[in-house]
Amino acid sequence: MTVEASGEAPAATRCGFVALIGAPNVGKSTLVNALVGAKVTIVSRKVQTTRALIRGIVIENNAQIILVDTPGIFSPKRRLDRAMVSTAWSGAHDADLVCVLLDAKTGIDEEAEAILAKAASVNHDKILVINKVDLVQREKLLALAQAANERMPFAKTFMIAAISGDGVDDLRSTLAEMVPPGPFLYPEDQMSDAPMRHLAAEITREKIYRKLHQELPYQSTVETDKWEERKDKSVRIEQTIFVERESQRKIVLGKGGATIKSIGADSRKEISEILGVPVHLFLFVKVRENWGDDPDRYREMGLEFPKE
């Protein structure tokens, strides 16, 4: 057994997967980013922006916490919807711990009720995380926590405001204590298992949603076609935004190309900040009819293609 200079044996490491499940827009992606301390997943006012399982990686004391940000769980209508919901529940069943998020303002509505009922069948310790507590009076929060715990037993209950970070440190510390003993699965300086090409595409997709949240429906996706690291340390990135109809392509381009220029500028700025080097971003918009029914697109997003 190795012994440190202090004469004490080094603390045994812990490592585990923690799945975050909940209704769309409950704040899962914001919480992942707050726990990690950096942006690893897309955040938008628009529901259903997370499509695949994105892992954020946190080191807390002697523990490595691998966060699985699942797509929001809802009643699926399209093929893409069904794939996203299936992915979310797979992430919950495969994890070591499950955090069930509730929106403090919405409470236990029909959507949350269905999630709680199904989450009860997951055979792992479950933690109740009530988010957006800054928007609700304390008495209502206590009643909500009690109502949720009556529906299923939670190992712990946390009340947080992910967007401001209130309560996040306590949650992180508890997750570190609850993940099982084991060696780290990722390098200590790694914050996500998503390739940078993928994260760059997600950042551009987020900017599209922020800019066009009223006009553009969900039938759009972004792919990073080219990633070139140049001699001057800058990075040249080419991305294609795919939409399903010509009318959508015109919306993304905007009058005189103004909209696509604005999206590109916002995306380039954020990617550059993350990489710490200048970024030259070139965006193209193409029509790919019925891409939502193409199995190859699902594989690229890390989703299983549902037969029907």
Swiss-Prot record:
Region named G3: 69-72
Residue ranges annotated for the KH type-2 domain, each copy included: 212-289
Binding site for GTP: 22-29, 69-73, 131-134
Assigned GO CC terms: cytosol; plasma membrane
Keywords from the UniProt entry: Cell inner membrane, Cell membrane, Cytoplasm, GTP-binding, Membrane, Nucleotide-binding, Ribosome biogenesis, RNA-binding, rRNA-binding
InterPro entries on file: G_ERA_dom, GTP-bd, GTPase_Era-like, KH_dom-like_a/b, KH_dom_type_2, KH_sf_prok-type, P-loop_NTPase, Small_GTP-bd
GO molecular function: GTP binding; GTPase activity; ribosomal small subunit binding; rRNA binding; small ribosomal subunit rRNA binding
GO terms classed as biological process: ribosomal small subunit assembly
Stretch list, region G4: 131-134
Listed Pfam families: KH_2, MMR_HSR1
Stretches for region G1: 22-29
Topology of this chain in the membrane: Peripheral membrane protein
Region ranges (G2): 48-52
Domain Era-type G: 14-181
Subcellular location: Cytoplasm; Cell inner membrane
Region of interest (G5), residue spans: 160-162
NCBIfam families linked: era (TIGR00436), PRK00089.1 (NF000908), small_GTP (TIGR00231)
Family: Belongs to the TRAFAC class TrmE-Era-EngA-EngB-Septin-like GTPase superfamily. Era GTPase family.
UniProt xrefs under HAMAP family: GTPase_Era
Quaternary context: Monomer.
Purpose of the protein: An essential GTPase that binds both GDP and GTP, with rapid nucleotide exchange. Plays a role in 16S rRNA processing and 30S ribosomal subunit biogenesis and possibly also in cell cycle regulation and energy metabolism.
Protein name according to UniProt: GTPase Era
Organism: Bradyrhizobium diazoefficiens (strain JCM 10833 / BCRC 13528 / IAM 13628 / NBRC 14792 / USDA 110)
